Protein backbone atom coordinates (compact mmCIF):
# COMPACT_ATOMS: atom_id res chain seq x y z
CA UNK A 1 0.00 0.00 0.00
CA UNK A 2 1.35 3.40 -0.94
CA UNK A 3 2.07 5.83 1.89
CA UNK A 4 1.20 9.49 1.45
CA UNK A 5 1.69 12.69 3.39
CA UNK A 6 -1.04 15.25 2.73
CA UNK A 7 -0.59 19.00 3.16
CA UNK A 8 -3.26 20.85 5.16
CA UNK A 9 -4.49 22.76 2.10
CA UNK A 10 -5.27 19.48 0.35
CA UNK A 11 -7.19 18.31 3.44
CA UNK A 12 -9.20 21.53 3.25
CA UNK A 13 -9.82 20.94 -0.45
CA UNK A 14 -11.28 17.51 0.36
CA UNK A 15 -13.42 18.23 3.38
CA UNK A 16 -14.07 21.98 3.51
CA UNK A 17 -14.10 23.14 -0.12
CA UNK A 18 -15.20 19.84 -1.73
CA UNK A 19 -12.81 20.49 -4.62
CA UNK A 20 -13.57 17.97 -7.40
CA UNK A 21 -9.82 17.51 -8.00
CA UNK A 22 -9.46 16.12 -4.48
CA UNK A 23 -12.26 13.53 -4.78
CA UNK A 24 -10.04 10.68 -6.09
CA UNK A 25 -7.77 11.17 -3.08
CA UNK A 26 -10.73 11.19 -0.70
CA UNK A 27 -12.08 8.01 -2.30
CA UNK A 28 -8.68 6.31 -2.05
CA UNK A 29 -8.45 7.17 1.64
CA UNK A 30 -11.99 5.94 2.30
CA UNK A 31 -11.33 2.66 0.50
CA UNK A 32 -8.00 2.30 2.34
CA UNK A 33 -6.13 2.26 -0.96
CA UNK A 34 -3.57 4.69 0.48
CA UNK A 35 -1.88 4.89 3.86
CA UNK A 36 -2.01 8.51 4.99
CA UNK A 37 0.78 9.34 7.45
CA UNK A 38 0.32 12.33 9.75
CA UNK A 39 1.86 13.61 12.96
CA UNK A 40 0.19 15.27 15.95
CA UNK A 41 1.75 18.53 14.76
CA UNK A 42 -0.14 18.22 11.45
CA UNK A 43 -3.42 17.63 13.27
CA UNK A 44 -2.75 20.68 15.45
CA UNK A 45 -2.16 22.78 12.34
CA UNK A 46 -5.46 21.60 10.85
CA UNK A 47 -7.29 22.43 14.09
CA UNK A 48 -5.77 25.93 14.12
CA UNK A 49 -6.55 26.60 10.46
CA UNK A 50 -10.15 25.42 10.84
CA UNK A 51 -10.64 28.36 13.21
CA UNK A 52 -9.82 30.95 10.54
CA UNK A 53 -12.92 33.14 10.01
CA UNK A 54 -13.10 32.64 6.24
CA UNK A 55 -12.98 28.85 6.69
CA UNK A 56 -15.58 28.93 9.45
CA UNK A 57 -17.89 30.80 7.04
CA UNK A 58 -17.22 28.27 4.31
CA UNK A 59 -17.97 25.36 6.61
CA UNK A 60 -21.24 26.99 7.71
CA UNK A 61 -22.26 27.40 4.05
CA UNK A 62 -21.48 23.73 3.38
CA UNK A 63 -23.03 22.45 6.59
CA UNK A 64 -19.73 21.02 7.82
CA UNK A 65 -18.23 21.55 11.26
CA UNK A 66 -14.59 21.64 12.29
CA UNK A 67 -15.24 18.63 14.53
CA UNK A 68 -16.48 16.67 11.49
CA UNK A 69 -13.33 17.57 9.55
CA UNK A 70 -11.16 16.52 12.49
CA UNK A 71 -13.14 13.29 12.81
CA UNK A 72 -12.37 12.54 9.14
CA UNK A 73 -8.70 13.26 9.81
CA UNK A 74 -8.71 10.95 12.84
CA UNK A 75 -10.50 8.21 10.93
CA UNK A 76 -8.24 8.19 7.87
CA UNK A 77 -4.80 9.37 9.04
CA UNK A 78 -2.30 6.96 10.59
CA UNK A 79 -0.65 8.81 13.45
CA UNK A 80 3.13 8.62 13.41
CA UNK A 81 5.77 10.55 15.38
CA UNK A 82 7.18 13.74 13.90
CA UNK A 83 10.24 13.09 11.75
CA UNK A 84 13.79 14.37 11.96
CA UNK A 85 14.72 17.31 9.76
CA UNK A 86 15.18 16.35 6.10
CA UNK A 87 18.40 17.31 4.30
CA UNK A 88 16.51 20.00 2.37
CA UNK A 89 14.80 22.90 4.11
CA UNK A 90 11.67 24.60 2.78
CA UNK A 91 11.46 28.39 2.64
CA UNK A 92 8.06 28.11 4.34
CA UNK A 93 8.74 26.73 7.83
CA UNK A 94 5.09 25.63 8.17
CA UNK A 95 5.60 23.14 5.34
CA UNK A 96 8.79 21.57 6.68
CA UNK A 97 6.95 19.02 8.82
CA UNK A 98 5.28 17.56 5.71
CA UNK A 99 8.60 17.32 3.88
CA UNK A 100 10.35 15.77 6.87
CA UNK A 101 7.67 13.10 7.29
CA UNK A 102 7.56 12.27 3.57
CA UNK A 103 11.34 11.89 3.43
CA UNK A 104 11.49 9.79 6.61
CA UNK A 105 8.86 7.36 5.29
CA UNK A 106 9.66 7.59 1.55
CA UNK A 107 6.04 8.63 1.08
CA UNK A 108 4.35 10.49 -1.72
CA UNK A 109 3.87 14.14 -0.73
CA UNK A 110 0.63 15.73 -1.90
CA UNK A 111 0.86 19.52 -1.75
CA UNK A 112 0.02 22.44 -3.98
CA UNK A 113 2.11 24.85 -1.92
CA UNK A 114 4.44 26.78 -4.22
CA UNK A 115 7.45 26.49 -1.90
CA UNK A 116 7.02 22.71 -1.67
CA UNK A 117 6.53 22.35 -5.42
CA UNK A 118 9.77 24.29 -5.98
CA UNK A 119 11.56 21.54 -4.06
CA UNK A 120 10.17 18.77 -6.27
CA UNK A 121 13.48 17.90 -7.98
CA UNK A 122 15.51 17.99 -4.76
CA UNK A 123 12.98 15.80 -2.96
CA UNK A 124 12.96 13.36 -5.89
CA UNK A 125 16.68 12.78 -5.20
CA UNK A 126 15.63 11.62 -1.74
CA UNK A 127 12.99 9.26 -3.15
CA UNK A 128 9.99 11.52 -2.54
CA UNK A 129 7.59 12.42 -5.33
CA UNK A 130 5.60 15.64 -4.91
CA UNK A 131 2.22 15.99 -6.59
CA UNK A 132 -0.25 18.88 -6.39
CA UNK A 133 -3.15 16.49 -7.06
CA UNK A 134 -3.34 12.74 -6.48
CA UNK A 135 -4.59 10.75 -9.44
CA UNK A 136 -5.04 6.98 -9.30
CA UNK A 137 -2.98 4.92 -11.70
CA UNK A 138 -5.05 3.52 -14.54
Segments from the language model and where they lie:
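Short, well-structured N-terminal submotif of metal-dependent ribonuclease cores
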Residues: 1-38
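Short beta-strands and strand-loop turn motifs
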Residues: 6, 80-83, 112
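Alpha-helix capping/helix-boundary segments
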Residues: 10-11, 42, 115-116
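Short, flexible loop segments at the rims of nucleotide/cofactor-binding pockets, characterized by
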Residues: 13-15, 59, 84-91
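Residues that scaffold the ATP/ADP-binding catalytic core of kinase and kinase-like folds
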Residues: 14-15, 49, 58, 119-120
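Residues at secondary-structure transition points
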Residues: 20, 37, 64, 89, ...
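PIN-domain endoribonuclease scaffold, especially VapC-family toxins
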Residues: 27-85
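Acidic, PIN/NYN-like endoribonuclease modules and their adjacent C-terminal/linker elements
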Residues: 89, 96, 103-110, 114-138
Amino acid sequence: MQSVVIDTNIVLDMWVFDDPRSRPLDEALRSQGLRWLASAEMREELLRVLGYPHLVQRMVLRGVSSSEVLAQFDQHAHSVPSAERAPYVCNDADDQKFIDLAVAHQALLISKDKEVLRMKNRLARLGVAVLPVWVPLA
